[in-house]
């Protein structure tokens, strides 16, 4: 059988660019680590394209343990944005055990400045960079959304780490509240399969100790505590049945943003657990897509 077809062009070819080193940082064991960013882009190495595209920096979750091998794991689920002409940049960051807070948000903001510095090379519109993250990545996303400069480093310091908008998927807004939640869960026998030793809670490993050991660091680690005049518009989505990060985190953040007069959209995903399939359906994608069409 021989057939001629003429497809309508409804989407661009999407390219994956990997192994891009954006920084090199020391670890607690004295070694150095290259930090990479992977891109989903409508522009390939041989593509003749002079356009600039908006960019969303993806920050992965995994209890602050996913910023290494798993940094680009969710890129397939973000193809729906790439097909809309949004460059997706999955940024690695130093994980717990490699560095303590604020190294993780330092790295994420360095990645933003790297992309802005190299905007022409990667066909990025430097005025249209946003951030999206889930779980622990949502925590870092909310910190980045404040645009307050307190976590900037000297790398690529000639440009801003400002993000235009942020999408937080079932993330953590208040580290101290998470710690108290987990302590209460121990008393109620609701932490099966997870450590009951406070020093081994992920949030304590992130801080390098209990929140009470360094209250200032613990407070700084909560995006809810840094809401200010520079905080960008934020979309929050959280599952009603989340058993890992309590929906109270997003409730508190929503009320704090509202009280501060900031632009916040809060969607409760009915019946959804932590990172469950409900977050990757067309209905939830449409919410994210519409928000970015308006704010990015």
Language model features by range: what are they?
Residues 1-296:
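Alpha/beta-hydrolase superfamily serine-hydrolase fold, recognizing
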């Amino acid at each position: 059988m021989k057939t001629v077809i003429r497809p309508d062009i409804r989407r661009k070819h999407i390219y994956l660019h990997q192994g891009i080193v954006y920084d090199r940082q020391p670890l607690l064991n004295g070694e150095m680590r290259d930090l990479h960013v992977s891109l989903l882009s409508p522009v390939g190495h041989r593509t003749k394209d002079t356009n600039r595209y908006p960019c969303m920096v993806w920050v992965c979750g995994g209890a602050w343990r996913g910023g290494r091998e798993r940094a680009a794991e969710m890129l397939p689920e973000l193809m729906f944005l790439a097909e809309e002409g949004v460059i997706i940049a999955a940024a690695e960051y130093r994980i717990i055990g490699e560095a303590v807070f604020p190294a993780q948000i330092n790295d994420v903001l360095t990645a933003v400045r790297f992309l802005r510095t190299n905007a022409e090379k990667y066909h990025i519109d430097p005025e249209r960079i946003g951030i999206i993250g889930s779980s622990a990545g949502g925590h870092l996303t909310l910190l980045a959304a404040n645009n307050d400069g307190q976590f900037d480093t000297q790398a690529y310091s000639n440009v801003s780490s400002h993000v235009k908008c942020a999408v937080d998927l079932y993330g953590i807004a208040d580290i101290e509240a998470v710690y108290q939640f987990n302590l209460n869960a121990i008393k109620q026998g609701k932490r099966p399969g997870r450590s009951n030793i406070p020093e081994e809670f992920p949030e304590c490993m992130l801080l390098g100790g209990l929140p009470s050991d360094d209250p200032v660091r613990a407070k700084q680690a909560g995006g809810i505590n840094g809401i200010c005049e520079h905080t960008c518009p934020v979309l929050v989505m959280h599952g009603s049945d989340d058993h890992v990060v309590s929906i109270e985190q997003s409730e508190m953040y929503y009320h704090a943003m509202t009280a501060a007069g900031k632009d916040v959209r809060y969607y409760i995903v009915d019946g959804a657990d932590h990172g469950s399939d409900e977050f990757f359906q067309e209905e939830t994608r449409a919410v994210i897509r519409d928000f970015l069409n308006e704010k990015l």
